[in-house]
From Swiss-Prot:
A GO biological-process term: peptide biosynthetic process
Entry keyword annotation includes Nucleus: no
Organism (species): Bifidobacterium longum (strain NCC 2705)
Gene name of this polypeptide: efp
HAMAP family, per database record: EF_P (MF_00141)
Single GO term (MF): translation elongation factor activity
Protein name: Elongation factor P
């Protein structure tokens, strides 16, 4: 649907030269001299490449409609992850490449937001944080305090993260899915 650059918002999907781009940040700028413009940071939906792009204000551009659905992760099948729509019980194959490094925090039963364009999955967003069980870590030394440093630990999905020295095997920890950082310990 044709609109202008004045309609750009965070999350808008633009069709530029036949490729889909998601607007991550935008700013309408009206300088003292010269015409107004829109400064954006956009992300290529397929490749994940992020670029800064400036558009003249009022310029016509093609916006695309994206369907967002909450799906539950079921299992891995070759080069795909299989998600289930819990309202229709349809199984949907999503290429592993759409998750990238975040796949290491994907646990069976996790609800994810999957974006579709013309029935094709474009992106998968995990929850902001997940709770996983520590399956392997070296024991901390006696007298360690919560701010005394970190050690490597492996969680149930096989991902390796850094945790405080007081964390032990079997502990459930909260992990930020954006950067893989430890954010806290959950009550068992």
């Amino acid at each position: 649907m044709a609109q202008t650059t004045n309609d750009i918002k965070n999350g808008s999907v633009l069709n530029l030269d036949g490729q889909l781009w998601t607007v991550m940040k935008f700013q309408h700028v009206k300088p003292g001299k010269g015409p107004a413009f829109v400064r954006t940071t956009i992300k290529n939906v397929l490749s994940g490449k992020i670029v800064d792009k400036t558009f003249n204000a009022g310029m016509k551009m093609e916006f695309e409609t994206v369907d967002n659905r909450t799906l539950q992760y079921s299992y891995e099948d070759g080069d795909n992850f299989v998600f289930m729509d819990m309202t229709t019980y349809d199984q949907i194959m999503v290429p592993k490449t759409l998750l990238g490094d975040k796949a290491k925090f994907l646990l069976e039963g996790t609800d994810c937001l999957v974006s579709f364009h013309d029935g094709t999955p474009l992106s998968v967003d995990l929850p902001g944080s997940v709770v996983l069980t520590i399956t392997h870590t070296e024991p901390g030394l006696q007298g360690n305090r919560s701010n005394a440093g970190t050690k490597p630990a492996t969680v149930e999905t096989g991902a390796e993260i850094q945790v405080p020295l007081f964390i032990n095997e079997g502990d459930r920890v909260k992990i930020n899915t954006e950067d893989g950082s430890y954010t806290g310990r959950e009550n068992n």
